[in-house]
Amino acid sequence: MPSDLPTPDAALRAVSAPEHNPLGTAGLEFVEFASREPKALGETFTKLGFKAIARHISKDVTLYRQGEMHFLINAEPDSFAERYAEEYGAGICAIGIRVANAQRAFDRAIELGAWAFEGERLGAGELLIPAIQGIGDSHIYFVDRWRGRGGQRGGLGDISIFDIDFRPIEIDTAHADLSHVGTGLVAVDHLTQTVGEGRMQEWLDFYRDLLNFREIHELHANWHVSAESRVMVSPCGAIRVPLYEEGTRRTNLMHEYLPDHPGEGVQHIALATDDIFACVEQLLANGVEFVEPPPRYYAQLDARLPGHGLDVERLKRTHVLVDGEIGADGVPLLFFQTFVRRGAGEIFFEIVQRQGHHGFGEGNLSALAQARAES
């Protein structure tokens, strides 16, 4: 079943509703990573099914592609990314948000109190992409050039930033690389962020006032947030940001599955797939390791979600957790998730699939805690 993320066409339609979407937000254009060991991070991306398809024309930045995702590894010396990696280790140092007009979006954000990011040096022929400072020393870029914006797949008047600022690694496969399937990961489902103790409201206001995000319960009335988290969603529906506040009570189990980010910033990134079982089986074949839930977790599943209709043995083999509910019509509304085993100083990845459920696995934390207690 397809994921619940809006299609590119649906995200583009949101641009034409200025009363709800004044920036013309239309999804994520890229996620930028910094690391003290960029080569090792690139190898991780390759295991996850991404392909290095282009390099920046003037900087040591590599573009990786899979599904609708663009991941950048910024290894430029004496750059913001290098300083970020020295301070925080491997992490997400910036995101690029598609908007109707980048300069207008930037100017509006500055007028509302955002701080400008002055950016790095520009090489010859390189685009100036406006950006503001985001959470935890990260940056948010506003991008108004992306493929498909004009209803086409490339061509004059429909050129992305990657057509201008990057050069293909393999000319012969450049066009095919734009549709790289990899392991079946298709999009970024959400970016979980930690905020400083006592600063939750400040960051809620940041997303609401500057970017026009809304809390998820405003969009899905039957969705209940936990006392320790809030979830913000972009006007186009394609960007989800769960927020957790530092200093709140965390169990040892949550630390294992959701390790703390050192300071404010992106704690982990969740990647969506349309078939989590096939995807994870391919990832396992690629050498990716996953956190293994206690066996008791699966023994409780029938009682917790009667009528789920799932192959429990396959869930076990792939280390997949499932949360959700059975709808009034008897149709299961499910959220699948599994966590890539994370080494010290590595990026934390989650793999998810949605079947009509808008949650983030809240029920799995209590189910895992119970399973641990009974094991």
Question: What is each residue range found by the language model?
Answer:
Residues I239-L243, P262-R341, I347-R354:
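Long compositionally biased, domain-poor regions of proteins
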Residues D60-V61, A221-V233, Y297-G307:
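Beta-rich nucleic-acid/ligand-interaction surfaces
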Residues I140-T194, R214, A238-P242, R249-E256:
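Acyltransferase donor/substrate-recognition loop-hinge adjacent to the catalytic core
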Residues A26-S35, E82-D107, P130-I132, V186-E197, ...:
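Vicinal oxygen chelate
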Residues Q193-D205, D209-P242:
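Beta-propeller domains
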